[in-house]
A protein has these predicted regions:
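Surface-facing alpha-helical segments and adjacent helix-coil boundary elements at the starts of domains
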Residues: 1-279
Length: 279
Protein backbone atom coordinates (compact mmCIF):
# COMPACT_ATOMS: atom_id res chain seq x y z
CA UNK A 1 0.00 0.00 0.00
CA UNK A 2 2.77 2.46 -0.79
CA UNK A 3 4.99 3.63 -3.63
CA UNK A 4 4.51 1.94 -6.98
CA UNK A 5 7.67 -0.02 -7.81
CA UNK A 6 7.81 1.34 -11.38
CA UNK A 7 7.39 4.99 -10.38
CA UNK A 8 10.47 7.03 -11.29
CA UNK A 9 10.97 10.48 -9.83
CA UNK A 10 14.13 12.41 -10.80
CA UNK A 11 16.56 13.16 -8.00
CA UNK A 12 16.36 16.91 -8.59
CA UNK A 13 12.70 16.77 -7.51
CA UNK A 14 13.75 15.65 -4.04
CA UNK A 15 16.46 18.35 -3.90
CA UNK A 16 14.16 21.24 -4.86
CA UNK A 17 13.78 24.23 -2.53
CA UNK A 18 10.11 24.72 -3.27
CA UNK A 19 8.11 27.60 -4.69
CA UNK A 20 7.53 30.81 -2.76
CA UNK A 21 3.92 31.10 -3.95
CA UNK A 22 1.34 28.44 -4.69
CA UNK A 23 0.94 29.80 -8.22
CA UNK A 24 4.64 29.16 -8.82
CA UNK A 25 4.53 25.43 -8.01
CA UNK A 26 5.43 23.62 -11.26
CA UNK A 27 2.63 21.47 -12.65
CA UNK A 28 4.61 18.22 -12.47
CA UNK A 29 5.48 18.90 -8.81
CA UNK A 30 1.87 19.70 -7.98
CA UNK A 31 0.72 16.51 -9.70
CA UNK A 32 3.18 14.36 -7.77
CA UNK A 33 2.21 16.06 -4.52
CA UNK A 34 -1.48 15.52 -5.24
CA UNK A 35 -0.87 11.89 -6.08
CA UNK A 36 0.96 11.36 -2.80
CA UNK A 37 4.16 10.38 -4.59
CA UNK A 38 6.41 13.02 -2.99
CA UNK A 39 6.59 15.15 0.15
CA UNK A 40 6.15 18.89 0.35
CA UNK A 41 9.41 20.75 0.98
CA UNK A 42 8.10 24.03 2.37
CA UNK A 43 4.99 25.60 3.86
CA UNK A 44 3.81 26.90 0.49
CA UNK A 45 3.65 23.39 -0.94
CA UNK A 46 2.22 21.96 2.28
CA UNK A 47 -0.67 24.45 2.26
CA UNK A 48 -1.33 23.91 -1.45
CA UNK A 49 -2.33 20.26 -1.04
CA UNK A 50 -5.97 19.41 -1.76
CA UNK A 51 -6.40 16.80 0.98
CA UNK A 52 -9.78 15.55 -0.20
CA UNK A 53 -8.41 14.90 -3.68
CA UNK A 54 -5.36 13.24 -2.15
CA UNK A 55 -7.60 11.03 0.00
CA UNK A 56 -9.50 9.93 -3.08
CA UNK A 57 -6.30 9.12 -4.97
CA UNK A 58 -4.73 7.21 -2.09
CA UNK A 59 -7.83 5.14 -1.36
CA UNK A 60 -8.28 4.41 -5.07
CA UNK A 61 -4.66 3.23 -5.22
CA UNK A 62 -5.43 0.93 -2.30
CA UNK A 63 -8.57 -0.46 -3.94
CA UNK A 64 -10.93 1.17 -1.44
CA UNK A 65 -13.34 2.98 -3.75
CA UNK A 66 -16.39 1.07 -2.50
CA UNK A 67 -15.57 1.69 1.17
CA UNK A 68 -15.13 5.42 0.66
CA UNK A 69 -18.08 6.40 -1.57
CA UNK A 70 -20.10 7.68 1.38
CA UNK A 71 -17.05 9.40 2.88
CA UNK A 72 -16.39 11.30 -0.35
CA UNK A 73 -19.99 12.52 -0.28
CA UNK A 74 -19.50 13.81 3.27
CA UNK A 75 -16.29 15.55 2.24
CA UNK A 76 -18.30 17.83 -0.06
CA UNK A 77 -19.24 19.71 3.13
CA UNK A 78 -15.57 20.62 3.57
CA UNK A 79 -15.52 22.91 0.54
CA UNK A 80 -13.89 26.18 1.50
CA UNK A 81 -12.69 24.94 4.89
CA UNK A 82 -9.19 25.73 6.11
CA UNK A 83 -6.57 23.00 6.04
CA UNK A 84 -6.56 22.79 9.84
CA UNK A 85 -10.23 21.79 9.70
CA UNK A 86 -9.83 19.41 6.78
CA UNK A 87 -6.96 17.31 8.18
CA UNK A 88 -8.81 16.40 11.43
CA UNK A 89 -11.99 15.70 9.43
CA UNK A 90 -10.12 13.22 7.24
CA UNK A 91 -8.47 11.72 10.31
CA UNK A 92 -11.88 11.15 11.89
CA UNK A 93 -13.21 9.45 8.76
CA UNK A 94 -10.20 7.16 8.72
CA UNK A 95 -10.76 6.38 12.40
CA UNK A 96 -14.39 5.46 11.76
CA UNK A 97 -13.38 3.27 8.84
CA UNK A 98 -10.57 1.58 10.78
CA UNK A 99 -12.89 0.80 13.69
CA UNK A 100 -15.08 -1.26 11.38
CA UNK A 101 -12.22 -3.54 10.36
CA UNK A 102 -10.89 -6.71 12.03
CA UNK A 103 -7.86 -6.05 14.23
CA UNK A 104 -5.21 -7.32 11.80
CA UNK A 105 -6.64 -5.40 8.86
CA UNK A 106 -6.96 -2.30 11.04
CA UNK A 107 -3.33 -2.49 12.11
CA UNK A 108 -2.07 -3.05 8.57
CA UNK A 109 -4.12 -0.19 7.13
CA UNK A 110 -3.07 2.21 9.87
CA UNK A 111 0.57 1.27 9.29
CA UNK A 112 0.16 2.07 5.60
CA UNK A 113 -1.20 5.51 6.47
CA UNK A 114 1.38 6.18 9.18
CA UNK A 115 4.33 5.15 7.01
CA UNK A 116 3.13 6.66 3.74
CA UNK A 117 5.60 8.45 1.50
CA UNK A 118 3.38 11.57 1.57
CA UNK A 119 3.76 13.82 4.59
CA UNK A 120 0.13 14.88 4.17
CA UNK A 121 -1.06 11.29 4.55
CA UNK A 122 1.07 10.84 7.66
CA UNK A 123 -0.64 13.94 9.07
CA UNK A 124 -3.95 12.07 8.85
CA UNK A 125 -2.44 9.25 10.89
CA UNK A 126 -1.52 11.67 13.66
CA UNK A 127 -5.14 12.78 13.94
CA UNK A 128 -6.34 9.17 13.88
CA UNK A 129 -4.41 8.84 17.13
CA UNK A 130 -5.41 12.19 18.59
CA UNK A 131 -9.13 11.71 17.93
CA UNK A 132 -9.28 8.13 19.17
CA UNK A 133 -11.43 8.23 22.32
CA UNK A 134 -10.47 4.62 22.97
CA UNK A 135 -6.94 5.71 23.88
CA UNK A 136 -6.06 7.37 27.17
CA UNK A 137 -3.54 10.21 27.36
CA UNK A 138 -0.61 7.91 28.09
CA UNK A 139 -1.44 5.77 25.07
CA UNK A 140 -1.93 8.78 22.81
CA UNK A 141 1.47 10.17 23.76
CA UNK A 142 3.09 6.80 23.19
CA UNK A 143 1.53 6.43 19.75
CA UNK A 144 2.08 10.05 18.67
CA UNK A 145 5.78 10.00 19.55
CA UNK A 146 7.04 8.75 16.13
CA UNK A 147 5.12 11.57 14.45
CA UNK A 148 6.65 14.12 16.82
CA UNK A 149 10.04 12.86 15.64
CA UNK A 150 9.11 12.67 11.95
CA UNK A 151 11.70 14.04 9.52
CA UNK A 152 9.05 16.31 7.97
CA UNK A 153 8.21 19.66 9.55
CA UNK A 154 4.50 19.43 8.73
CA UNK A 155 4.01 16.05 10.34
CA UNK A 156 5.80 17.25 13.49
CA UNK A 157 3.47 20.25 13.76
CA UNK A 158 0.34 18.20 13.22
CA UNK A 159 1.57 15.66 15.79
CA UNK A 160 1.36 18.04 18.73
CA UNK A 161 -1.81 19.66 17.43
CA UNK A 162 -3.48 16.25 17.22
CA UNK A 163 -3.03 15.58 20.94
CA UNK A 164 -3.15 19.13 22.27
CA UNK A 165 -6.81 18.92 23.28
CA UNK A 166 -6.11 15.71 25.20
CA UNK A 167 -3.09 17.33 26.85
CA UNK A 168 -5.14 20.37 27.83
CA UNK A 169 -7.92 18.18 29.27
CA UNK A 170 -5.47 16.38 31.57
CA UNK A 171 -2.82 19.03 31.90
CA UNK A 172 -1.23 18.01 35.21
CA UNK A 173 -0.84 14.42 34.05
CA UNK A 174 0.48 15.54 30.68
CA UNK A 175 3.09 17.80 32.26
CA UNK A 176 4.34 14.91 34.36
CA UNK A 177 4.45 12.51 31.44
CA UNK A 178 6.26 14.99 29.20
CA UNK A 179 9.12 15.59 31.65
CA UNK A 180 11.14 12.63 30.28
CA UNK A 181 10.51 13.95 26.77
CA UNK A 182 12.10 17.27 27.71
CA UNK A 183 15.42 15.51 28.40
CA UNK A 184 15.22 13.02 25.54
CA UNK A 185 18.36 12.66 23.38
CA UNK A 186 16.29 13.51 20.29
CA UNK A 187 15.86 17.30 19.93
CA UNK A 188 12.64 16.72 17.99
CA UNK A 189 11.13 14.99 21.01
CA UNK A 190 12.37 17.73 23.35
CA UNK A 191 10.79 20.30 21.07
CA UNK A 192 7.49 18.39 21.02
CA UNK A 193 7.40 18.45 24.84
CA UNK A 194 7.54 22.24 24.83
CA UNK A 195 5.59 23.08 21.68
CA UNK A 196 2.63 20.87 22.62
CA UNK A 197 2.03 22.84 25.83
CA UNK A 198 2.58 26.41 24.65
CA UNK A 199 0.07 28.66 26.44
CA UNK A 200 -1.09 30.20 23.18
CA UNK A 201 0.42 28.07 20.46
CA UNK A 202 0.07 28.39 16.72
CA UNK A 203 -3.13 27.33 14.92
CA UNK A 204 -4.31 25.91 18.23
CA UNK A 205 -6.62 26.73 21.12
CA UNK A 206 -5.04 28.46 24.09
CA UNK A 207 -4.41 26.51 27.28
CA UNK A 208 -5.98 28.81 29.84
CA UNK A 209 -4.39 27.12 32.86
CA UNK A 210 -0.91 27.81 31.52
CA UNK A 211 -1.78 31.37 30.59
CA UNK A 212 -2.84 31.95 34.18
CA UNK A 213 -0.21 29.79 35.88
CA UNK A 214 2.81 29.26 33.59
CA UNK A 215 4.90 28.02 36.52
CA UNK A 216 3.14 24.66 36.13
CA UNK A 217 5.42 23.97 33.17
CA UNK A 218 8.66 25.13 34.78
CA UNK A 219 10.09 21.60 35.28
CA UNK A 220 9.96 21.08 31.51
CA UNK A 221 11.21 24.56 30.66
CA UNK A 222 14.12 24.34 33.09
CA UNK A 223 15.27 21.15 31.39
CA UNK A 224 15.79 22.96 28.08
CA UNK A 225 16.89 26.40 29.28
CA UNK A 226 20.31 25.89 27.65
CA UNK A 227 19.45 23.49 24.85
CA UNK A 228 22.04 23.46 22.08
CA UNK A 229 19.53 23.00 19.24
CA UNK A 230 17.94 26.13 17.75
CA UNK A 231 14.77 24.19 16.96
CA UNK A 232 14.29 23.59 20.68
CA UNK A 233 15.51 27.05 21.65
CA UNK A 234 12.91 28.67 19.41
CA UNK A 235 10.14 26.63 20.99
CA UNK A 236 11.26 27.53 24.52
CA UNK A 237 11.57 31.23 23.73
CA UNK A 238 8.20 31.24 21.96
CA UNK A 239 6.69 29.51 25.00
CA UNK A 240 7.95 32.24 27.28
CA UNK A 241 6.90 34.93 24.83
CA UNK A 242 3.39 33.46 24.97
CA UNK A 243 3.50 33.61 28.76
CA UNK A 244 4.76 37.20 28.73
CA UNK A 245 1.42 38.35 27.30
CA UNK A 246 -0.36 37.48 30.56
CA UNK A 247 2.48 37.09 33.09
CA UNK A 248 5.28 39.48 32.08
CA UNK A 249 6.87 39.68 35.53
CA UNK A 250 7.02 35.91 35.85
CA UNK A 251 8.81 35.68 32.50
CA UNK A 252 11.29 38.37 33.53
CA UNK A 253 12.01 36.50 36.75
CA UNK A 254 12.51 33.17 34.98
CA UNK A 255 14.83 34.74 32.42
CA UNK A 256 16.85 36.48 35.14
CA UNK A 257 17.19 33.22 37.05
CA UNK A 258 18.25 31.31 33.96
CA UNK A 259 20.84 33.93 33.08
CA UNK A 260 22.37 33.57 36.54
CA UNK A 261 22.25 29.78 36.53
CA UNK A 262 23.34 29.20 32.94
CA UNK A 263 25.07 32.12 31.28
CA UNK A 264 25.67 30.28 28.00
CA UNK A 265 25.14 31.51 24.46
CA UNK A 266 22.20 29.11 24.17
CA UNK A 267 20.46 30.50 27.25
CA UNK A 268 21.21 34.07 26.18
CA UNK A 269 19.58 33.44 22.80
CA UNK A 270 16.50 31.93 24.45
CA UNK A 271 16.20 34.82 26.91
CA UNK A 272 16.61 37.46 24.19
CA UNK A 273 13.88 35.92 22.08
CA UNK A 274 11.65 35.21 25.08
CA UNK A 275 11.57 38.86 26.15
CA UNK A 276 11.09 40.36 22.69
CA UNK A 277 7.56 41.52 23.51
CA UNK A 278 8.47 43.05 26.86
CA UNK A 279 9.29 46.73 27.18
Amino acid sequence: MNAKPDLFIPEDVFLRKGARRATEIPEHIRNWLQAGHIESVNLTEWLAIDHVSLFQKVTHEWGMDAETIEIMEQFKQLNGQRIMKIIPAIGMQWLNLLNRLPVNERMNLFRSIAEHRSDSVRCWAAYIIGLNSGLNLTEKLEHIRPFGADHHFGVREIAWMAVRESISAELSLALQQLIPWSVDPDPLIRRFAIESIRPRGVWAKHIQELKENPAMALPLLDAVKSDAHKYVQDSVSNWLNDASKTNPEWVRQVCATWTQQSNTQHTRRIVTRATRSLT
